[in-house]
């Protein structure tokens, strides 16, 4: 620890004392991996139609990789709202998501309903996820989606104290309902296309999950169809930048 106003500098072992040190919601470089590559960002055409397809509850040991491959087949990117506990299980996948230019966002640490938590538990859900992401890829999420969409003023204030923008969705495919259905992949595909085309048909945020086989299979089919109709698959941040889609407050 150093402070330019101090005449005498002191050194504190952060790893041994991390439970007693507040870092103003920021991690320290020594906790980040040193081999992280710069992300491969996509080129966005502001004049073309866009949809931001978001994937909750990962990373998954195999399906997250498959989802990334699906987006990249069409020069697209996704936004992955990941659980901190899963980031700790699969840090290499988190790192890959970041390096390949997809967006990593927070879905809290263990998918708790935040409106039912006290202030301390709420803070832990946010903080531990930020730390898990930083440890895996050297950066922290700037977007967060509350599990179940559950929010109130206390939850929103906690998000903003970490500099996090809350993102919900325009279309919920309810893909989890079809995870064990024989024709589930086709239903998910149809729902993704429906939600991408709803309202003005340009600039929607669509919700699926990258932890179900049928969801990712449905994603693959939907991307193929939507790409033929001129859609770009962009991150939430790019959607906000180019289409003016505001965060949800």
Residue ranges of predicted features:
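Terminal accessory/targeting
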Residues: 1-51, 69-78, 202-249
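Active-site beta->alpha N-cap acidic-glycine motif
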Residues: 20, 24-117, 121-141, 225, ...
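Alpha-helical scaffold elements lining the catalytic groove of polysaccharide deacetylases
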Residues: 63, 112-137, 150-202, 217-218
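Residue-level detector of anion-binding/catalytic polar loops
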Residues: 77, 103, 165, 172, ...
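Noncatalytic linker/hinge segments flanking ATPase motor cores
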Residues: 94-98, 120-125, 143-151, 183-190, ...
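Residue-level recognition of the N-termini of beta-strands and the immediately preceding loop/turn
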Residues: 140-142, 203-204
């Amino acid at each position: 620890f150093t402070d330019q106003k101090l005449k005498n500098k002191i050194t504190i072992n952060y790893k041994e004392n991390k439970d007693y040190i507040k870092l103003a919601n920021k991690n320290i470089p020594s906790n980040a991996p040193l081999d992280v590559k710069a992300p491969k960002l996509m080129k966005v055409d502001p004049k073309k139609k866009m949809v931001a397809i978001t994937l909750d509850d990962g990373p998954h040991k195999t399906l997250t990789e498959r989802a990334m491959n699906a987006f990249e087949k069409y020069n697209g990117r996704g936004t992955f709202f990941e659980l901190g506990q899963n980031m700790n299980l699969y840090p290499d996948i988190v790192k890959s998501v970041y390096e390949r230019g997809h967006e990593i966002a927070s879905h809290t640490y263990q998918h708790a309903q935040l409106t039912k938590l006290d202030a301390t538990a709420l803070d832990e859900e946010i903080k531990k996820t930020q730390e898990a992401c930083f440890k895996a890829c050297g950066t922290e999420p700037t977007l967060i989606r509350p599990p179940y969409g559950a929010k109130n003023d206390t939850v929103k204030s906690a998000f903003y104290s970490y500099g996090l923008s809350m993102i919900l969705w325009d279309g919920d495919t309810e893909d989890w309902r079809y995870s064990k259905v024989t024709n589930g992949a086709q239903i998910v595909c149809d729902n993704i296309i429906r939600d991408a085309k709803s309202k003005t048909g340009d600039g929607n945020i669509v919700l699926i999950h990258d932890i179900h086989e049928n969801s990712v299979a449905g994603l693959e089919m939907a991307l193929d169809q939507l790409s033929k109709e001129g859609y770009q698959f962009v991150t939430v941040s790019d959607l906000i930048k180019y289409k003016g889609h505001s965060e949800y407050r």
